[in-house]
């Protein structure tokens, strides 16, 4: 019986899982919509919902807890200055998961995880080294 086992292991060590969810949380906060596999999206949702709740609290201790979780100061700034006030009146349920078919190659189920009431312009903004190189050239 598997009673009481929460979450999935994803065939990774604990540290690798924590790093993976930190990176995915930062990507979701940055772009407000990401595509990943369905099990990863299902396990990412509670992590991000707790981060949004920290952003709604807005005090110094909550900010330090968020920094310890996602390790990206710019994303923590967005979390507390943009997302926290945006969801101040909403009592939870900040993310939505939509199934997105199956991945070519290994047929893994894909999902789109996004924020409810997301900023549609945030998707793909300043993403990747090519964008950074283009901005540096200007």
From Swiss-Prot:
Family classification: Belongs to the bacterial ribosomal protein bL17 family.
Subunit composition and interactions: Part of the 50S ribosomal subunit. Contacts protein L32.
Keyword field contains Secreted: no
Top-level lineage group: Bacteria
HAMAP family: Ribosomal_bL17
Species per Swiss-Prot/TrEMBL record: Methylobacterium sp. (strain 4-46)
Protein's UniProt name: Large ribosomal subunit protein bL17
PROSITE patterns in alphabetical order: RIBOSOMAL_L17
Annotated GO MF terms: structural constituent of ribosome
GO BP, sorted A to Z: translation
């Amino acid at each position: 019986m598997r009673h009481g086992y929460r979450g999935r292991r994803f065939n990774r060590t604990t540290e690798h899982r924590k790093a993976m969810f930190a990176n995915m949380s930062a990507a979701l906060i940055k772009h407000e919509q990401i595509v990943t596999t369905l099990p990863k999206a299902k396990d990412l949702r509670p992590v991000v919902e707790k981060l949004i709740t920290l952003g709604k609290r807005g005090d110094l201790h909550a900010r330090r807890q968020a920094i310890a979780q996602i390790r990206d100061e710019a994303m923590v700034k967005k979390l507390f200055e943009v997302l926290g006030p945006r969801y101040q009146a909403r009592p939870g349920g900040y993310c939505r998961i939509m199934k997105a078919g199956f991945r070519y190659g290994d047929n893994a189920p894909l999902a789109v995880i996004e924020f409810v009431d997301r900023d549609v312009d945030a998707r793909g903004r300043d993403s990747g080294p090519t964008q950074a190189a283009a901005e540096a050239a200007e």
